[in-house]
From Swiss-Prot:
The lineage of its organism: Bacteria, Bacillati, Mycoplasmatota, Mycoplasmoidales, Mycoplasmoidaceae. Keywords: Exonuclease, Hydrolase, Nuclease. InterPro entries: DDH_dom (IPR001667), DHH_sf (IPR038763), DHHA1_dom (IPR003156), Oligoribo/pAp-PDE_c-di-AMP_PDE (IPR051319). This is Bifunctional oligoribonuclease and PAP phosphatase NrnA. It comes from Mycoplasma pneumoniae (strain ATCC 29342 / M129 / Subtype 1) (Mycoplasmoides pneumoniae). It is an enzyme of class 3 (hydrolase). Monomer or homodimer. Signal peptide: none annotated. Bifunctional enzyme which has both oligoribonuclease and pAp-phosphatase activities. Degrades RNA and DNA oligonucleotides with a length of 5 nucleotides and shorter, with a preference for longer oligomers. Also degrades 11- and 24-mers, but less efficiently. Directionality is controversial; shown to degrade 5-mers and less in a 3' to 5' direction, and 11-mers in a 5' to 3' direction. Converts 3'(2')-phosphoadenosine 5'-phosphate (PAP) to AMP.
Length: 324
């Protein structure tokens, strides 16, 4: 693990904040993935098991992802100003309000305290009072497991299952290079806690006819520029395959193809609005994402483009980054 990575706050600071509040509201980011939902609900289940007197509320919308995880959400209308004034807000796996589901609750600035648990090497606009930010972790869910282990909290099977989902998905099945000994050790703690590993593997690795058709279209229509391979999921494609922009977020279909060091998905979300997913096998794509107002990790980042003309510029900038 790189000792020079971005860090802010600590496990002890996060544990202290959680222990000090009897009402806790946990947020996830927009375009939810396995890590933000797994960290959110894993943390909620941990708190409910170890501090049964505390009230824990998960707010947001999973967008039909992982229905088998049996997530329970509280309607945001139930998070009243009176509740917020007594509560700790916990934001997992995110740093800016524009990236957070139910951000309007945070905009009111009514929470008694705000804790950020995140593995992204970015600053934030959350007005946090407490932090556990550490970019050496592969997933926010890994941070939550480490927190639980170091605090000697009991890991229930439902909590362990949610947290394993977060680590498994954000590490791309433990294939990403920043998977560490700690990742595997904490993963083993989830096995020991009887996480439903088989269920997660079965659910995430089965293939439908729609999946095959999606991949077939991508493989027939991808584009290349020197050592960069990419696909544009425009509205025409989405209509043809009857998929939503969120369902198009599958950049790793083009992963690790010989000679292509960076792979990209450009997903049209609206007029002159393209979301870019950057991935690489070692090249720093975060630098390119930052140039276009995005961010993320060295090998996995994202950004939003305001013009279709920027697509080729991004591709060219990625090729330049390979040459650095």
């Amino acid at each position: 693990m790189n000792s020079q990575v971005h860090r802010k706050g600590s496990i002890a600071e996060a544990v202290s904040a959680i222990q000090a509040h009897d009402k806790i509201v946990i947020f996830h980011h927009i375009r939810p993935d396995g890590d933000c939902l797994g960290a959110q609900h894993g943390l909620a289940r941990l708190i409910q098991t170890n501090f049964p007197h505390k009230q824990v509320f998960c707010v947001g919308d999973p967008k039909h992802n992982f229905p088998w995880l049996e997530m329970v959400f509280t309607p945001k209308e139930q998070i009243t100003p009176e509740l917020m004034q007594q509560a700790l807000a916990v934001i997992v796996d995110a740093n800016y309000k524009e990236r957070i589901e139910c951000r309007d609750l945070l905009d009111q600035n009514q929470f008694k305290a705000v804790l950020r648990i995140d593995h992204h090497p970015n600053e934030d606009d959350l007005n946090t009072t407490h932090n556990f930010v550490d970019a050496s972790y592969i997933a926010a869910a890994e941070q939550v497991v480490d927190l639980a282990v170091q605090a000697k909290w009991k890991l229930s099977p439902p909590a362990a299952t949610a947290l394993y989902l977060g680590i498994y998905t954000d590490s791309n099945r433990f294939l990403y290079s920043n998977t560490s000994w700690r990742t595997l050790y904490l993963g083993s703690m989830l096995y020991r806690a009887q996480a439903n590993i088989a269920k997660i593997h079965d659910e995430l690795n089965h293939t439908s006819l729609k999946d095959i058709q999606f991949k077939q279209y991508v493989f027939k229509n991808f584009q290349t520029f020197q050592n960069v391979i990419y696909f544009v999921a425009d509205k025409k494609f989405q209509k043809k395959l009857k998929v939503t922009p969120l369902e198009c977020a599958r950049v790793n279909i083009l992963a690790n193809i010989e000679q292509f060091h960076i792979w990209l998905f450009f997903i049209e979300e609206g007029k002159n609005h393209y979301r870019v997913e950057f991935r690489s096998n070692g090249i720093n794509v975060r630098e390119v994402a930052l140039k276009y107002g995005g961010g993320g990790h060295i090998q996995a980042s994202g950004a939003v483009l305001k013009s279709k003309r920027d697509i080729i510029r991004v591709v060219q900038d990625c090729q330049k980054q390979i040459a650095v």
